[in-house]
Amino acid sequence: MKKIFCTVMFALAMSAGVSAENAANSTAGTATDKAVANKYVPTEGNLAARSHFQDSKFGIFLHWGLYSMLATGEWTMTNNNLNYKEYAKLAGGFYPSKFSAREWVSAIKASGAKYICFTTRHHEGFSMFHTKYSDYNIVDASPFKRDIVKELADECHRQGIGLHFYYSHIDWGREDAPLGRTGLGTGRPKEAQNWDSYYQFMNSQLTELLTNYGEVNAIWFDGWWDQDINPSFDWRLPEQYALIHKLQPSCLIGNNHHSQPFDGEDFQMFERDLPGENTAGLSGQAISKLPLETCETMNGMWGYKITDQNYKSTKTLIHYLVNAAGRNANLLMNIGPQPDGCLPEVAVERLKEMGEWMKVYGETIYGTRGGLVAPHDWGVTTQKDNRLFVHILNLQDRSLFLPIGSKKVRKAVDFATRKAVKTQKCDGGVLISLDEVPTDVDKVIEIQL
């Protein structure tokens, strides 16, 4: 009877798909002329940085700019057709008196996150750092007169947290920026567009960011999709990517273009979806062989929105992190800081609670790759050397079949308690028997192969 049960379970498990490791290393579809063409050759340092990035597994995204003052999200300028000259006046009142880079980085580090990605300049066009190439920045245009990016970069380096810079290819406030499908109601004159001027401006700012702020682990681009209505538009990415890799060869480049990676990119990102899913309609691209990252918000918006108190539970956030790791991806979880410079109280509490969980189970996340067993409805697996970590997130039974083929299980224990777990060899895998139906946020079984 047990053999029949195991055989049935093996068939069901195999029908669910291939392993997460194989899925993460596969490609599908026909490459376009802009897809990876093997022209870019990363340095050894860059390859090492990619591996370190994959080991990190968990980062925090911070969307902060003038839009926080209006408390209606980071797209409020275009969503409400705010005139670019009137919007710019917000800078004169931006004074985040409670901002403390030390408190931010400390709270984020306590969560178990290994890196921070900060919006140096979002679509609104306001630079959160002191730039020579525009007066529209935190030091020259606001009474605050402090370089937010500098303080944050210094604190990240001090506390050993990785530093990633978000940089938008869009600017709803610059007259020379190309008009795309967003920001059309901000009043910018069409005749003022000057792509060469705007492109040079962006490269000049990127040079500042990669020269004046110490080691930068990644540049996170956004906005390519603003010109998807104009297929002939050339963002001149190869030249821009080459500049970045020249200034800091180990700096990783990712682009939120919702397509397969382009030549010169070092990791692939997915927005509001896990790799292989497309519930939000933004992540239909095939999974590449590059390191993977999925970004999601802790509540509903990226930037601060006063009415958005729909924060995900700690359990949901942990499950998102675990599901990402089981699909060979990092999780970049977003928080929108308040206009006074504080991280929202609920967000800080979530960070603390995630950190408590990571203190116990971090070993099953950090440094792992997608496991031997593909993701299932019950959960996922992660793997490190000969150790397979079975993350049981949703199981209404005391038994679980793992399709690991002919691999021999040398030992199986409850990761947290180190108590032995019963296993039975079956056709095509092994059957795990638990003492009771798991009710933990994440029941982790460690299997030594």
Predicted regions and their residues:
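General helical structural elements
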Residues: 6-7, 276
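Positively charged n-region of N-terminal signal peptides that target proteins for export
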Residues: 1-4, 108
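Mature catalytic domains of secreted/periplasmic carbohydrate-active enzymes
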Residues: 21-449
